[in-house]
Amino acid sequence: MAQLYFYYSAMNAGKSTALLQSSYNYQERGMRTLVFTAEIDNRFGVGTVSSRIGLSSQAQLYNSGTSLLSIIAAEHQDTPIHCILLDECQFLTKEQVQELCQVVDELHLPVLCYGLRTDFLGELFPGSKYLLAWADKLVELKTICHCGRKANMVLRLDEQGRAVHNGEQVVIGGNESYVSVCRRHYKEAIKAACCS
């Protein structure tokens, strides 16, 4: 039975690695996968899902105007697909998450979504909000803070390495701009940034 999965975490927990491994597992069995990634995130190249450990795969791009249902249905009609995998799902719109539900319910295809739960202010991203609400299965991928506790928050850093406590929700960056931390160290960093 097909289901909608949401694998979520803070940054650097291995979401892209897990996506690539899942896709490989299907392909190894002779099954076709369709991989998507957000057009806005081109840190590792356009149309590429890349992991920090060196794995990568080509992917179709999506943006806020992309009809995922139309693309998936057309691809599936042309050559059967066995699994849909999407990276950077925090950037999905409400409508796109609804379309992914349709892919599961009407096309009977499993959909595996990978993304951040919250932004640098601790607020849900739109895509994450609706995936948390509508996914059949929620799976937290864990990473650790520098203190050894589970990291469930993301700090955005300025050029001097200080926490940023306001600004646009989406600013694309990697390890130089963001760090995953536990809630305690998140609060300490934000407090220090607000008081300086």
From Swiss-Prot:
Instruction: Using the UniProt record, name the top-level EC class of this enzyme in a single word.
Output: transferase
A GO cellular component entry from the record: cytosol
Does Electron transport count among this protein's keywords? no
EC number(s)?
2.7.1.21
Active-site residue list: E88
The record, for Pfam families, names: TK
Where in the cell? Cytoplasm
Q: Give the matching InterPro entries.
A: P-loop_NTPase, Thymidine_kinase, Thymidine_kinase_CS
Residues given in the record as ATP binding sites: S9, A10, M11, N12, A13, G14, K15, S16, D87, E88, C89, Q90
The catalysed reaction is: thymidine + ATP = dTMP + ADP + H(+)
GO molecular function list: ATP binding; thymidine kinase activity; zinc ion binding
**Stored PROSITE patterns:** TK_CELLULAR_TYPE
Alphabetically sorted, this entry's keywords are: ATP-binding, Cytoplasm, DNA synthesis, Kinase, Metal-binding, Nucleotide-binding, Transferase, Zinc
Q: Which residues bind Zn(2+)?
A: C145, C147, C182, H185
Keyword flag Metal-binding: yes
User: Which regions form coiled coils?
Assistant: none
Signal peptide location: none
Task: Just give the chief location class.
Answer: cytoplasm
Q: Which cysteines are joined by disulfide bonds?
A: none
PANTHER family of this UniProt entry?
A: THYMIDINE KINASE, THYMIDINE KINASE, CYTOSOLIC
- Subunit structure of this chain's protein: Homotetramer.
Protein name as annotated: Thymidine kinase
Task: List the taxonomic lineage.
Answer: Bacteria, Pseudomonadati, Pseudomonadota, Gammaproteobacteria, Enterobacterales
